[in-house]
């Protein structure tokens, strides 16, 4: 998983995020540990420090030894380097564990989750009637190598087992300890806040024939698991890709076709342990 997300650092992720065009960098960021990247101590960064032509050649080869070369010339010209502009914000450094706190909120990004120094620009939005404000830490998408942590203090008298951290409205964990609820942070540019879910998922029959189709919906913490039995015997329901549906082909279950009545019991549980039981009779 870490290697997959490290590819974001090897490419120009910000350009891809805005254009969906992917370019690879000719250098490695200091915290990029992709095992197939090899550079010298300069990490592939070229210092054009003379007024002359520099001929660069890129060689791309595959495992069969086929290769293609592309050469081009960069003309070195003396240029005045402007003074760096001091931007406001908090710098998270790639080579250490970083943290950031506000009243009732604490963010931790452990060592190894950033591939370069990153300037945080924390932003908050007030949410009237909610358990917390919402927070974002970067002006655009900024994925981490793996998950960091964000914690919120629960300052209202509610059932803590129903509180969770939402990331852009999607469940992102909810471990409660000593008044704090902790969830996952995968992208510093997403919005995080507390949410509450004491409502069970909905189970709606779509088809109850030989091929059973049920619709599962949960608009808050999301469905975590489900289990089904027919006449007390376990049967498998498969999820349908990109749709809130689960299906069961009765011909692939232990239930024999006798054209008699059978009882289907389907239990769905969401990420805050709210449970919905759907029962019906089917003829098979």
Regions found by a protein language model. Name each.
Residues 1-77, 173, 183, 219-284:
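Long, low-complexity serine/threonine/glycine- and acidic-rich segments characteristic of extracellular
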Residues 86-95, 120-166:
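Proteolytic processing hotspots in large secreted/extracellular or virion-associated proteins
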Residues 94-120:
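Predominantly extracellular/luminal regions of secreted and cell-surface proteins
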Residues 112-116, 156-160, 186-189, 218-223:
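Short proline/glycine-enriched turn/loop motifs at strand-loop junctions of beta-rich domains
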Residues 139-194, 234:
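Proteolytic-maturation and junctional protease-sensitive modules
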Residues 142-144, 204-208:
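Short, solvent-exposed loop/linker segments at the N-terminal edge
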Residues 149-153, 211-219:
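Short edge beta-strand/loop segments characteristic of extracellular beta-sandwich folds
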Residues 198-202, 223:
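Proline-centered linker/hinge motifs at extracellular inter-domain junctions
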């Amino acid at each position: 998983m870490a290697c997959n997300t490290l590819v974001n650092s090897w490419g120009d992720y910000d350009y891809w995020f805005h254009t969906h065009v992917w370019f690879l960098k000719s250098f490695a960021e200091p915290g990029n540990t992709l095992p197939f990247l090899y550079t010298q101590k300069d990490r592939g960064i070229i210092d054009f420090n003379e007024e002359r032509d520099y001929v660069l050649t890129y060689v791309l080869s595959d495992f069969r030894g086929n290769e293609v070369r592309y050469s081009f010339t960069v003309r070195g010209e003396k240029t005045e380097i402007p003074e760096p502009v001091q931007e406001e914000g908090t710098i998270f450094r790639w080579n250490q564990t970083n943290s950031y706190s506000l009243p009732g909120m604490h963010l931790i990004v452990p060592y190894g989750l950033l591939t370069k120094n990153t300037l945080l620009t924390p932003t908050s939005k007030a949410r009237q009637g909610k358990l917390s404000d919402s927070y974002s830490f970067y002006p655009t998408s900024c994925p981490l190598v793996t998950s960091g942590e964000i914690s919120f203090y629960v300052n209202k008298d509610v059932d803590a087992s129903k509180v969770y951290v939402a990331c852009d409205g999607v469940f992102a964990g909810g471990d409660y300890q000593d008044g704090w609820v902790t969830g996952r942070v995968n992208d510093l540019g997403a919005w995080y806040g507390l949410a509450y879910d004491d409502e069970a998922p909905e189970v709606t029959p779509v088809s109850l024939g030989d091929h059973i189709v049920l619709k599962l919906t949960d608009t808050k913490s999301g469905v975590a698991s489900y289990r089904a039995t027919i006449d007390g015997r376990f049967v498998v329901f498969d999820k349908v890709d990109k749709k809130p549906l689960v299906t069961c082909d009765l011909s692939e279950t232990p239930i024999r076709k006798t054209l008699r009545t059978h009882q289907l019991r389907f239990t769905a549980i969401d990420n805050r342990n709210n449970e919905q039981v759907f029962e019906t009779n089917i003829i098979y």
